[in-house]
Amino acid sequence: MEKKKIVILGAGESGAGAAVLAKAKGYDVFVSDSGAIKDKYKTIFSENKIAYEEKQHTMEKILQADEVIKSPGIPSKAPVMKKIYEKKIPVSGEIEFASRYTKSKMIGITGTNGKTTTTLLTHHILTKAGLKAGLAGNVGHSLAMMVAQDPRDYYVLELSSFQLDDMKTFKADIAILLNITPDHLDRYPSFENYIDSKFSITRNQTSADAFIYCEDDLVIAENLSQHNISAQPYPFSIKKKTIPGAYLDNNEIIINLKNHQNPTFTMSIHNLSLQGRHNIYNSMAAAVAANILNIRKEVIRDCLSDFRNAEHRLEHFATVHGVDYVNDSKATNVNSTWYALESYHRPVILILGGVDKGNDYSILKDLVCEKVKAIVCLGKDNKKIHKAFKDCVKMIVDVSSADEAVATASGLATKGDVILLSPACASFDLFENYEDRGRQFKRAVKAL
């Protein structure tokens, strides 16, 4: 019998993992990437005898596929995808494909902001509790690679809307929806489509599964009833009492998973390692998931108080001459920058800008007027930023490199200030990606 052909589009972390798993499961595998493939992935393909091409898409080969597994970074309207859809070849994502070959528990986490922090925190709790847990999706390793080579009992997955769009049969045993604010509107026809994409994390869930969500998020609250959700709901809120779920009472996080008054778990917000209102939400979500999994209270409490956040996410990098330098390069949308500013109660010099994804800066205006003493614009086209904040910030300066941004910001700063790289934009105009932007920022700070 002829082997089924699988074509994998995109040869990054997820593509390489999908290729290795498909090969292990007996498929005829071909990997195609329109860009250059990193050496580490070429080595993986060679070692596993997987055919690949780079810097091109050979349509003749691609259209012979029985199934295509595409990278989440490839939009559905890309020319290569249009031809695949025309030929009615089934298309999946790496997470969807990997989930067919494991019966392990899946904890899926999505939202416009806070996904990475909540995913890392949840994984930290599970690991410290002694559970064999993998970290995958948008952070950590490829799920498919782990399923193929290093299977775990639990997988904690950070899921972007693009990954959720490529899922049909995937089911989260625990689904977490943190918030929904306008983002990626360059990839979605409307905000409603993006909302539907986020809610699709509940697809295929049954009454035996859990859906943890933020009750205070207006978009989630308004759209809940329009989605047929079968899972047991566990809302969390800092504004009202939610049972079963999590809420705030006198600066104490109270988690109650039963329909009665006795709390399952309590902890003071002053003991959280992650401060700021958005991080109370992130901590609540992770703690509810851990409680559902019956992890011991002491372990959850320890993890919420000793967790260190990811690189590039409100990362306090250095203090030089009494000025704090904070790398929040992962803030690629306006809401992420709003959360960052909301965390500080000292004067901020804000490094802002990059590739604008249709940003509405008016959301930031009140916080910028209140907290920001100068803006350093790091991008090729900063007209929108100047227009948005010219009335409330005296000093707005344009720069074209991380070195220049840090030098300019430190020249404007005085002791006690915070220099915050929180760009609210994608990074592709001046940098490879947000990691490259964050690392260049830290190198420039080090050079001070």
Feature map (PLM): residue ranges:
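Phosphate-binding loop of NTP-binding sites
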Residues: 4, 23-24, 59-63, 72-215, ...
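C-terminal helical cap/extension that packs against the catalytic core
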Residues: 42-43, 362-417
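Beta-strand->loop->alpha-helix junctions that form or flank phosphate-binding loops
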Residues: 55-56, 92-96, 229-248, 303-305, ...
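Short internal beta-strands
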Residues: 28-34, 211-215, 351-352, 371-380
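Nucleotide phosphate-binding/pyrophosphate-handling subdomain across enzymes
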Residues: 2-5, 15-25, 132, 267-373
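Residues in the short beta-alpha loop(s) of Rossmann-like NAD(P)-binding domains
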Residues: 12, 35, 139, 216-217, ...
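N-terminal leader/targeting and accessory segments in enzymes
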Residues: 1-93, 97, 275, 387
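Short beta-strand "acidic-cap" motif of Rossmann-like dinucleotide-binding folds
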Residues: 29-33, 134-135, 156, 235, ...
